[in-house]
Curated annotation (Swiss-Prot):
Pfam families: BTB, zf-C2H2. One of its GO terms (cellular component) is nucleus. This is Zinc finger and BTB domain-containing protein 44. A zinc finger (C2H2-type) spans 394-416, 422-444. Residues 289-298 have a biased composition (Basic and acidic residues). Gene3D superfamilies: Classic Zinc Finger, Potassium Channel Kv1.1, Chain A. The keyword Phosphoprotein does not apply. It is found in: Nucleus.
Length: 448
């Protein structure tokens, strides 16, 4: 007679054992490690912490086995961030909200609990999208109630088990200019914000903490670059570009021209001084703006070679000259040419006569720019090719100047950002380009 074998599998055994371990921890039994966070003591079991955290595993495995009690100080986490993670280790349930999400994410990253950190990042992303759309609904509910009702039906909660963005297009409610500008200022991860967002995902397993977070405002520090890159959706941004291209084929009125120029030059966030100017004229004026200011404000005379260099950029039929200027270190951008010409001329962000840059300097200061977003749309079949040589696809989103190479745009963007890495060792003056610093040092050599 053969041996009979019976296998019993209990699905709830692991959860039951974890619950009993949590009871032992709360009662203080068999706790062999003490964790000190901001002068607060937490008792726990080494085996539980080492099983759920690679950080604790590395710390505890190297210690002597005979040490019955050890004390571990965590200096880089807070009590607010550590407490939910300790509860998660013993209960497999994580409770976070918009108030403690930053501390929990920092503690999870420090303790190498990457699955929890990923969940916190997705919650932050969905919470930001949800709160932004709720503000839009309250702001535009009276103007377009039909679209807003459809919007409410499309998003029910800021969080889901997958925390992914719904892959469908929703009716978009327009918001006021004042609302857009305030949102741009409060979001430090992105220099540009468009007024289009995606819908929030549906809830599969909602919890009370998520429901409470629905009515709370999101702090500006929640918008991390790695969780909510640049604050815009690439799909809706491409649709916005297509709509702008299609509008160029129509003949609009004066108000339409003003809105179109504003969208094109400053991504719907800057003011246009002349609303009756066509879009092509504005491009030319923006390109020539720096040269006009140089002739008006510079007190000392400009050399003939430098003035001819800046004038040759917009002369038709000078393809070879223009290409040489783009490659030359003396003329990587229009703004940097002005800085090399005169040391007494203030930078673009401090010039009072340029109304186009006045509103953008506050939000573009000390910001790293995602240059890949500024690739202008390709020339459509209805537009004529540029008479100034090859097309310049790289456009500055602040002043509208176009460049042939991305390196020239990067150099030009330093002017708007206020970053001046090159400093004179004699007088302490800072410059955007190394060539400007070199020309400035010639002054000291001439004086000495």
């Amino acid at each position: 007679m053969g041996v009979k074998t019976f296998t019993h599998n209990s699905p709830g055994h692991s959860q039951e054992m974890l619950g009993k371990l949590n009871m032992l921890r709360n009662d203080g039994h068999f706790c062999d490690i003490t964790i000190r966070v901001q002068d607060k003591i937490f008792r726990a079991h080494k085996v539980v912490l080492a099983a759920c955290s690679e950080f604790f595993r590395t710390k505890l495995v190297g210690q002597a086995e005979d040490s019955s009690q050890c004390v571990l100080d965590l200096h880089h986490v807070t009590v607010t961030g550590f407490t939910p993670l300790l509860e998660y280790a013993y209960t497999a349930t994580l409770s976070i909200n918009t108030e403690n999400i930053i501390d929990v994410l920092a503690a999870a990253s420090y303790m190498q609990m990457f699955s929890v950190a990923s969940t916190c990042s997705e919650f932050m992303k969905s919470s930001i999208l949800w709160n932004t759309q709720q503000e839009k609904i309250l702001d535009t509910g009276q103007e377009n109630p039909v679209n807003c009702n459809n919007f409410r039906d499309g998003s029910l909660s800021p969080v889901s088990s997958e925390c992914s963005v719904v892959e469908r297009t929703i009716p978009i409610c327009r918001e006021s200019r004042r609302k857009r500008k305030s949102y741009i200022v409060m979001s430090p991860e992105s220099p540009l914000k468009c007024n289009t967002q995606t819908s929030s995902p549906q809830v599969l397993n909602p919890t009370p903490s998520y429901a409470e977070a629905r009515n709370q405002s999101v702090d500006s520090s929640h918008a991390f670059p790695w969780t909510f890159p640049f604050g815009i959706d690439r799909r809706i941004q491409s649709e916005k570009v297509k709509q702008i291209e299609s509008r160029t084929l129509e003949l609009p009125g004066p108000s339409e021209v003003a809105r179109r120029v504003t969208d094109y030059v400053a991504c719907e966030s800057t003011k246009v001084s002349s609303p009756l100017v066509m879009e092509d004229d504005v491009r030319v004026k923006v390109e020539r703006l720096s040269d006009e200011e140089v002739h008006e404000e510079v007190s000392q005379p400009v050399s003939a070679s430098q003035s001819s260099m800046s004038d040759q950029q917009t002369v038709p039929g000078s393809e070879q000259v223009q290409e040489d200027l783009l490659i030359s270190p003396q003329s990587s951008s229009i703004g940097s040419i002005d800085e090399g010409v005169s040391e007494g001329l203030p930078t673009l962000q401090s010039t009072a006569s340029t109304s186009v840059h006045a509103d953008d300097d506050d939000r573009l200061e000390n910001v790293q720019y995602p240059y890949q977003l500024y690739l202008a749309p390709t020339t459509s079949s209805t537009e004529r090719p540029s008479p100034n040589g090859p097309d310049r696809p790289f456009q500055c989103p602040t002043c509208g100047v176009r460049f042939t190479r991305i390196q020239n745009l990067k150099q030009h963007m330093l002017i708007h950002s206020g970053i001046k890495p090159f400093q004179c060792d004699r007088c302490g003056k800072k410059f955007t380009r190394a060539y400007s610093l070199k020309m400035h040092r010639l002054k000291h050599e001439a004086i000495s």
